[in-house]
A protein has these predicted regions:
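C-terminal ends of transmembrane helices
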Residues: 42-48, 114-125, 162-163, 233-241, ...
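Structural signature of hydrophobic alpha-helical transmembrane segments
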Residues: 96-110, 150-154, 214, 218-228, ...
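Central hydrophobic cores of alpha-helical transmembrane segments in multi-pass inner-membrane proteins
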Residues: 106-120, 137-138, 157-161
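Cytoplasmic-side transmembrane-helix entry/capping segments in multi-pass membrane proteins
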Residues: 127-136, 153-156, 163-165, 246-254, ...
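Membrane-interface helix-loop-helix junctions at boundaries between adjacent transmembrane segments
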Residues: 128-186
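Long hydrophobic alpha-helical segments that form multi-pass transmembrane helix bundles
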Residues: 162-232
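Loop-to-transmembrane alpha-helix initiation sites
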Residues: 272-279, 301-303, 321-333
Length: 361
């Protein structure tokens, strides 16, 4: 790394003001910041000191996503060969590489288009390149069906957060992001139909998947959303590094479980199974905890998380037309997050004023 650092230091003057490549300054600084910690300092005293900067935060989130991504790649191959009937004669590596062949183009398109636009806009406007797309570029293919067209993945890079992209295509092109066939890779016209657990629940059918299948992830679904176990590994990474809020994360599961208990007679499935189906676990860990769109106050995080979990189950059970209620619940509560924080702050102000008056008297 010292060789690379020395090389960049020698090339840096060419990209600074007055250099031959001055107009590519944003591109150079983008690559430099990705590889090394920026050497810029504040003009006045720093008020907050922390070992984690934005780049490290984004990298931690990406690392937390890797277990779910790797299993998702394997599961794409597993579901394909299970549908066509050749699972017993297929090795682990055949399953994994088939899934990689299907998922890797989605990841490449997402990053190439998204980062390409990010670099181009930063270059035109002279802004610094934002590392945030390191996460969004991976989230987009992970929350899409494996059979989603690549043009859809490319267009998804225009939205942030990534969940908004899925919502847009869900309502604009429902046939490409719903049904039974889109979750199974390859030509499965003559294969056994594999409905997701959510679809079976919405149709009032008995679940053909065991709780173990749903926990480990051997079910059809979006690329990165099937394995609750791998998502749990990612949750531990986010919580140990303080990147995600445990208040929000736990509240989502609590709210979802309590509401699932209430609606258990309607849904026909066990309450805990609701937490393992669809994108509930993935949304609770990686989407609801987005520090930009979620509630900021501690009390607000509890309220925000409880409402997301409860609303996700309500949408699933009341409206079978939208079996994946987690997406709509998170987007709706993202809208109300500032209002939740406002009420929490106002309540705190009133409580302190009341306490001050009591002391004064």
């Amino acid at each position: 790394m010292n060789f690379l650092r020395n090389y960049l230091d020698k090339q840096k003057p060419k990209f600074e003001k007055g250099g031959k490549l001055e107009k590519f300054h944003s591109v150079f600084t983008g690559f430099e910041s990705f590889l090394f910690v920026p050497n810029t300092t504040t003009s006045s005293g720093a008020h907050i000191r922390d070992a984690v900067d934005l780049k490290r935060t984004m990298i931690i989130v990406v690392l937390a996503l890797i277990p779910a991504l790797l299993f998702g790649i394997y599961n794409v191959g597993y579901q394909h060969f299970n549908a066509v009937g050749g699972l017993a004669d297929t090795t682990f590596f055949q399953l994994f590489f088939y899934g990689l062949w299907k998922v890797l183009p989605m990841i490449i398109v997402s990053y190439v288009v998204g980062l390409g636009i990010e670099f181009a806009v930063a270059q035109m406007k002279g802004h610094e390149i934002n590392e945030g797309f390191l996460v969004s570029g991976l989230l987009i293919p992970m929350i899409m069906p494996v059979e989603a067209p690549l043009w859809m993945v490319a267009l998804s890079t225009a939205w942030n957060p990534a969940l908004l992209a899925r919502a847009f295509f869900f309502f604009s092109y429902p046939s490409m992001i719903s049904g039974d066939k889109v979750w199974i890779a390859g030509d499965t016209a003559d294969a056994i139909s594999q409905a997701t657990p959510l679809a079976q629940m919405a149709l009032g059918q008995p679940l053909t998947y065991s709780t173990a299948d749903m926990f480990w992830g051997f079910i059809p679904g979006s690329v990165g959303e099937t394995s609750a176990f791998c998502i749990l590994i990612g949750a531990v990474i986010l919580l140990l590094t303080n990147v995600a809020s445990w208040r929000t994360m736990i509240s989502v599961f609590v709210g979802g479980y309590l509401m699932a208990l209430i609606f258990q007679p309607i849904s026909g499935v066990e309450a805990y199974q609701q937490l393992l189906m669809g994108g509930f676990a993935f949304g609770a860990v990686f989407m609801a905890t987005d520090p930009v769109t979620s509630a900021q106050t501690n009390t607000g995080k509890y309220v925000y998380g409880l409402l997301i979990g409860a609303m996700a189950v309500i949408i699933r059970c009341i409206n079978p037309g939208y079996p994946e209620g987690m997406m709509l619940a998170i987007l709706l509560m993202n809208t109300f997050a500032p209002l939740i924080d406002w009420f929490v702050v106002q309540a705190n102000i009133k409580r302190r004023l009341k306490r001050a008056k009591a002391v004064a008297n």
